[in-house]
Amino acid sequence: WSDQFPHIKATGDISGDCSYEKISKKNYKGKTLKINTHAVPVIGQPTALHAEQFAKLTGATVDVTHTPAGDLYAKAMVPFKAGQAPYDIVFGFSNFINDWRQYLAPVPKKYLNTVEMKDVTKSHVGVSSWDGTMYQYPVDGDRHYLKYRKDVIDNPEMQKKYKADTGKELKVPTTWKEYGEMAKYFNGWDWDGDGEKEYGSAEVMKKDDLMFAAFFSRSVAYAKNPSTPGGFFFDLETMKPNVNNPGFVEALTDWVEATKYVPPGGINFGLGDEIGSFGGGQTLFSFSWDDAFIAAMQDDSPIKNKVGTAPLPGADKVWNRVSGKWDNKYNQAPYIVWGWAVGVAKKSKVQEMAFDYLCFFSNGANHQADLAIGNFGVNPFKNSDFDPKLYTETMGWD
């Protein structure tokens, strides 16, 4: 099938219940599937690509609408509440599940039992489900972590220069304060010799474009205290939002300072901008989803195999919401950040076709190909995604 669909040239078709071979036997001629998804490229581009492939294989007509991140919730919820279903498939964020689930068709048993679904990690089955019922079809997995330039951080000459100029060690930062200090130092000069200025950090700072997730990743070090389980977003007794407590304020103070070490225009970076900036070699650091790291490891990236990863930085103090004081101890809280989610409208008249499309979207061949493209926004969520051979042999990473 790779001769007809070059997207899967690295693997060809991969055996499964929703493989190219299996889906090609479906006949949806005369039927139309309507999808609302995110704007291109992130998740919107693979949605459109797999829609085109699905149409070619099955004879279906597939209409894809692209919507900005900030409007995805309302684009589905407004017609849902009016008893309408203008889209058979709606993409959004997995934290929409409680509001959307009454309007979504539960994933049928035959799809729960597919080879593809049985490969999904337990955590992402949980993210897609409510009270044991799966309402959102797993197509993506999320986690935030640190990305950095190994050719700088691990460079003995750079380490020597940084030590001489600052009196501090150049190493992978373990606190947000260290992250900021290093990012400032490496901001605004050509430190990799490519003839262009580089900058400290690429971050998602644009309003209504996933900046909330970036802020939470900065906040957890200061506000997620292991001594006070739960209650990160709200007080467990009063449901008063915690966002104004000193932990969140400290993170916001750091983030305001970060506006001084991002590239020109960086305070308006959306996710796609962050991916292109770090992936294209413009910055020393980045943190968010896998996408920027994947972009940096693509064959067309000037920094392929020059990047490293580490858990999110921590902090030397963490707010204790119970005592109302700072606990002066090191705290690091890796953050799993929901994921792109998608469901089938309960009032859709083509539910089987819709679920076939979603199963095809995430089949083995498509998923492995999608993982290798940074701005597609598809990240690991299957057990097989954590086999190193997928990246070293199939994708050619060091």
PLM feature spans:
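Immediate post-signal peptide segment of exported/extracytoplasmic ligand-binding proteins
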Residues: 1-34, 55-56, 187-197, 353
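Extracytoplasmic/periplasmic substrate-recognition and gating elements
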Residues: 132, 260, 300-385
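Short helix-initiation/N-cap motifs at beta->coil->alpha
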Residues: 66-75, 174-178, 266-280
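Short, polar/charged alpha-helical segment
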Residues: 17-24, 41-61, 147, 151
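Hinge/lid segment of periplasmic solute-binding proteins
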Residues: 1-27, 93-147, 214, 308-312, ...
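Periplasmic solute-binding protein
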Residues: 95-105, 124-168, 180, 203-236, ...
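Glycine-centered hinge/linker elements that transmit conformational signals in sensory
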Residues: 178-184, 214, 222-268, 311-317
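Extracytoplasmic "Venus flytrap"/periplasmic binding protein-like
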Residues: 49-123, 129-136, 155-157, 161, ...
